[in-house]
UniProtKB/Swiss-Prot annotation:
EC number(s) on file: 2.1.2.10
Keyword Magnesium: no
GO cellular component, one term: glycine cleavage complex
Function: The glycine cleavage system catalyzes the degradation of glycine.
Subunit structure: The glycine cleavage system is composed of four proteins: P, T, L and H.
HAMAP family in the record: GcvT
Species annotation: Clostridium botulinum (strain ATCC 19397 / Type A)
PANTHER family xref list: AMINOMETHYLTRANSFERASE (PTHR43757), AMINOMETHYLTRANSFERASE, MITOCHONDRIAL (PTHR43757:SF2)
Listed name of the protein: Aminomethyltransferase
Main EC class the enzyme belongs to: transferase
Length: 370
């Protein structure tokens, strides 16, 4: 594909039957054996994803913690060394620049994991707000490959080829210098599927060997490579948000029900804090809701939500859920129509189909939190 970037794993996709698409400027596999099969593999067994297109940045220096807090809505002070935090990075109006993971290595050393489509924008935003903070910011995206191994059997399989007890890496914790098939990696118990699992950061030159080693280790258990199609249905069922769908620079964390990750009572200031405090006091005018389509059809991103002939919002993500076997979606609607049980219509092509607001936590799976 012309002018598209590739990850260090580009050469292995076809070996496994990967169908390649353009995603965020990268050649990436949308599926291997079919996204339904892959979706169920992750829910029931374990699946391996190439997520090397994600961005990474290091922030180091005396003021690293203070600087990260100035950029992020969550409370960075709660992070201990070798812990991970999910957070938003907002603009002055409270709109979301990105949602990302902050890895704390030490008081003066942080590692940020950035959405692929926002890499350049995020790094520029971070650099532009350095000000007088005593920090060094380095975009390390090109020197890191990232694999995600997700599913109920992920720990059991990965344990065969690592030199540490994976049970010691708790949910949203990390360990550096883990030998995975003899190669030094950073391993965190994190993911984007709603299942237990790990994200593995390695040198680009080690990625192919690790890919083959993990799949070979899980051959008996039925581990499979997974494409972008199933990655999206898995995150959607678990009500994990996607930048560009559920949020963007005009949508705030409060509007999408993620106020828990915007700590408005902390002493420290952060970009967007005043706007979010004001919005919380006044109340949001729109909300992200889950819905089930009652008529036959499939809701898609961008479809209008209609009540009594009036457009009240739009679908952010919609699918026929492979796990629940029904057409469900997320929609950003006017606040007065956001209560569970509210009925409205979704305009699918030229027809208005009946839908009802439901709890947006469509699927929950216990992860290891202890």
């Amino acid at each position: 594909m012309k002018d598209l970037k590739v990850t260090p794993l580009r050469g292995v996709y076809e070996e496994y039957g990967g169908k390649i698409v353009d995603f965020a400027g990268y050649e990436l596999p949308t599926q291997f054996k079919g996204f339904l099969h892959e979706h169920h593999t992750v829910r029931e067994k374990a699946g391996l994803f190439d997520v090397s297109h994600m961005g990474e940045a290091m922030v180091t220096g005396k003021d690293a913690g203070k600087f990260i807090q100035y950029l992020m809505t969550n409370d960075i002070n709660v992070l201990k060394d070798n812990e991970v935090l999910y957070t938003f990075m907002c603009n002055e109006d409270g709109g979301v620049i990105d949602d990302l993971l902050v890895y704390k290595f030490a008081e003066d050393e942080f590692f940020l994991v950035i959405n692929a489509s926002n890499k350049d924008k995020d790094v520029k935003w971070i650099m532009d707000h350095k000000g007088d903070f005593d920090v060094e910011i380095v975009d390390v995206s090109d020197s890191i490959a990232q694999l995600a191994f997700q599913g109920p059997l992920a720990e059991e399989i990965l344990q065969k080829i690592v030199d540490v007890d994976l049970q010691e890496i708790k949910f949203f914790k990390l360990k550096r210098d883990v030998l995975v098939n003899g190669k030094k990696c950073l391993v965190s118990r994190t993911g984007y599927t709603g299942e237990d699992g790990f994200e593995i950061y390695c040198k680009p030159e080690d990625a192919k060997g690790l890919w083959h080693a993990i799949l070979n280790a899980g051959k008996e258990e039925g581990a499979q490579p997974i494409g972008l199609g199933a990655r999206d249905t898995l995150r959607f069922e678990a009500s994990l948000l996607l930048y560009g769908n559920e949020m963007d620079e005009t949508i705030t964390p409060l509007e999408v029900g993620m106020g828990f990750f915007a700590k408005l009572k902390i002493e420290e200031d952060f970009i967007g804090k005043d706007a979010l405090i004001k919005q919380k006091a006044e109340g949001v005018t729109r909300k992200l809701v889950g819905f089930e389509l009652l008529d036959k059809g499939i809701p898609r991103h961008g479809y209008e939500v209609i009540k009594d002939g009036k457009v009240i919002g739009h679908v952010t993500t919609g699918y026929k859920s492979p796990t629940l076997n029904k057409a469900i979606g997320l929609a950003l609607v006017e606040e007065q129509y956001s209560k569970i049980g509210t009925e409205f219509n979704i305009k699918v092509r030229k027809k208005e189909l009946k839908a009802v607001a439901i709890d947006k936590r469509f699927y929950t799976k216990k992860t290891k939190t202890k």
